[in-house]
């Protein structure tokens, strides 16, 4: 059982992300990695799949997935950086509190997923506060970078702006297709 749990938490093989929609069975496999399933579910929910998109627009959900993944990783890294860098807009205790809340929710989510190994357990709805904390940390990190005169900081802010804009546009297009399909 422990090896199975470890495998579920650490396996990030390509077969799981070859299809960016949640896989419930009958497709290539069933979701088992809570991190990947959470990301897929946060974007597409349990019911959106390739049938909602015209063949010539399949790049849209895939680009949205990968941009969301990059933004999630940036948010996590930003949280760690912001926690330990002195900032004017948040005290260490406030940043530590957000980090502890994030870690507690995420830890409980993974525990829940391991104890109840079902696809529906790996739903994004169980960790929505983590997304909000990630957004706060991206904001604090962006503010920190905007105060810096260093070129890498300016490049990071520009990259975040472009990625966020692309995420918004691709989300709109995605849900335009979903709404058009459901009529």
Regions found by a protein language model. Name each.
Residues 109-128, 179-182:
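Membrane-interface catalytic loops of GT-C/OST-like multi-pass glycosylation enzymes that act
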